[in-house]
Amino acid sequence: MSEQTEWYGNLEAKVETLKAQLGADARDYYLGRFLKIARRIGEFAADCPHCREFQTLMDNMIKDLSYAPTQITKEQKRLFLGNANTILSHLKKTHGLISDGQNTGIFLAIGAGVGVSLGVVFKSPIIGIPAGVALGIVFGAVLDMRARKAGKTI
């Protein structure tokens, strides 16, 4: 087992323990997303010094929450979520990863805009907007599928 896989396995076990301790409040911390981010950080840590630093940070983040999970302050929660977003931002900017479904959402909005334009041209928003939205969803879904196949999703 590689060092990175071992790190992820240990972190996953700690997160599962934390989920059990937090109970229903666990969803407020997006721990599922946290594990997806951790898996990708583990994959890039061998080649990226920032990812190696983030591994230590992620260990500390879970350790801090595990001390007294029922007495977590709003500041601790805000810090946890802020750090997770910082790490996610690094993965997106430095390693070119995208969130699953990101392109679909973006192109849905673009398609709606194009649909409004088509509705004006054809003098019928009933035709233009749904057509634009449909094209946007299809185009975004295709790009998301390509990203998934290329292993570029988080």
Locate the predicted segments by residue.
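N-terminal leader/propeptide segments of preproteins
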Residues: M1-C48
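Membrane-proximal, non-transmembrane alpha-helical segments
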Residues: L57-A109, S117, V121
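Short, charged juxtamembrane terminal tails flanking transmembrane helices
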Residues: K149-I154
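N-proximal short alpha-helices
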Residues: W7, R27, L31-F34, T86, ...
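Generic, low-specificity signal for short hydrophobic/alpha-helical stretches with a mild N-terminal bias
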Residues: E12, E16-K19, G23, E43, ...
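Short, well-ordered alpha-helical segments
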Residues: P49-L57
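Small-residue-enriched transmembrane alpha-helices
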Residues: N103-V120, S124, G128, G132-D144
